Each structure stands twice: as structure tokens, then as C-alpha cells.
Regions:
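ATP-dependent carboxylate/acyl-activation modules
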Residues: 1-224
């Protein structure tokens, strides 16, 4: 069986993946405010988004923006006023806000091991979210520099979040990106890490040092 993407490899060819995919459910609870928000075996999501990036942190933050709900970032404003005790209690609840509670717990200094004990979420994922929180703290401490901007964009932190933590305006962040010529590149989605040519390529944006998009001719069409 020939791989329909590369046209050169077979179905028995072991895939080599150089990107991460995050699928995130879309919950309808903002419309059904009285509905039970607990998550279990019953289907409650009304849709989902899928995001691709070179890092898990970046794919997660992309997915949150794609939901077009709330703040579009790993933060819930209503958690700001909760006490540390309340945050620990909320961690034990399995609902649509659990990921945001987890991030808030890390902001408050609760150790990943304690979060793992309460939630049973694998430490691998908790550490990845902790990387995002560490970037927030770095921006708060160091402000916006070429180095911190590149590090923040490497994990797909959006401009409004960077502006908030660096305590500057969104326009300043945009000017910094232009000053340092920092813009997203486009990588090809295939199953062979670009080892073979892909005959049905599609792309995702990421902040790296190499663009894999090739001119397709005068009559090329871009589909978003």
C-alpha cells in the first residue's frame, strides 16, 4: 500500500514526526450556564480544534486561541480572586476549566508533584504547562528583550499575553517583532520529517529559522 502523501513510501514505513498536534474540545457551557460542567464518559463537547507546532507548549497555546472563547490564553480571570485553598480544591474537580486551574496552581507556587497527586495528570504534561508559567515569570522579571521575545514566541505566546507580563503595550510588542525581524515560518506536515518529498503538502506556522514553503508556480492558491 503506497503512502498517499509521499507517493514513495509504503504503509509499513515507520512515521517520523517532527511536529506536535493538540486536539482541544469546544464546550458549550457559556450558552448553557446551568448545565453540569463535570467531564466524564458522557459526550458533552460540541466541537474541537486541532493545532500544530514544533513544541507541545506552542500547540497548546495555539489551540486555546483557535477556540475563540474566553481570553484565548491559559488564564481565567475569575480564578484571580480565589485563595490558595480554593485552587487546591478546584484541582480535584474534573470539569472544562481544569487545565486553567492547573496553570493557576503553578502560578501560585503549588509544586507539579502535588498537582500530579491531586489530579493524576501525568507529570510530563504538568511540566510542559510549567514551562509556559516560567516564561510568564521571566517576562515579568526581565521585561521584553530580543532573547525573551524569541523565547516567548517559540512557545507561541500571543502578543497580548507578552504585553501583559512585560508590562508594555501590544503595539510595543509588534514594534519589537518588526525590529528583530521576528515572524513565523511555515513547516510542512508529512510523515517522514521532510526525508522524502510530499506530494500533498500542507503547512503550519511556527517560529524557527527555516521556511519550508516552496513556490508552487504562478497559479498557486492558498487555502486557510
Amino acid at each position: 500500500i503506497t503512502n498517499s502523501i509521499t507517493k514513495r513510501t509504503k504503509a509499513c514505513f515507520e512515521p517520523s514526526i517532527d511536529y506536535i498536534v493538540v486536539k482541544f474540545p469546544r464546550w458549550p457551557f457559556e450558552k448553557f450556564t446551568l448545565a453540569d460542567r463535570s467531564i466524564g464518559t458522557q459526550m458533552k463537547a460540541t466541537g474541537e480544534v486541532m493545532a500544530l507546532d514544533r513544541t507541545l507548549e506552542g500547540a497548546l497555546l495555539k489551540a486555546l486561541r483557535s477556540l475563540e472563547a474566553g481570553e484565548g490564553y491559559l488564564h481565567l480571570k475569575k480564578l484571580d480572586g480565589q485563595s490558595l485553598y480554593d485552587i487546591r480544591c478546584l484541582l480535584s474537580r474534573i470539569d472544562n476549566e481544569r487545565l486553567f486551574v492547573l496553570a493557576e496552581a503553578l502560578r501560585r507556587g503549588i509544586e507539579p508533584e502535588e498537582i500530579n497527586r491531586i489530579t493524576k495528570i501525568d507529570l510530563f504534561f504538568i511540566y510542559k504547562i510549567q514551562n509556559i508559567i516560567r516564561m510568564e515569570r521571566r517576562l515579568l522579571k526581565e521585561g521584553l528583550t530580543e532573547e525573551t521575545l524569541k523565547a516567548a514566541k517559540r512557545i507561541q505566546m500571543p502578543d497580548p499575553a507578552i504585553a501583559h507580563f512585560a508590562e508594555i503595550s501590544i503595539k510595543d510588542v509588534e514594534n519589537f517583532r518588526k525590529k528583530f525581524n521576528l515572524h513565523p515560518d511555515y513547516k510542512m506536515v508529512d510523515t517522514c520529517a521532510a526525508e522524502f518529498e510530499s506530494y500533498t503538502p500542507y503547512y503550519y506556522s511556527t517560529y524557527s529559522s527555516e521556511d519550508e514553503v516552496k513556490p508552487q508556480g504562478e497559479n498557486a492558491v492558498i487555502v486557510f
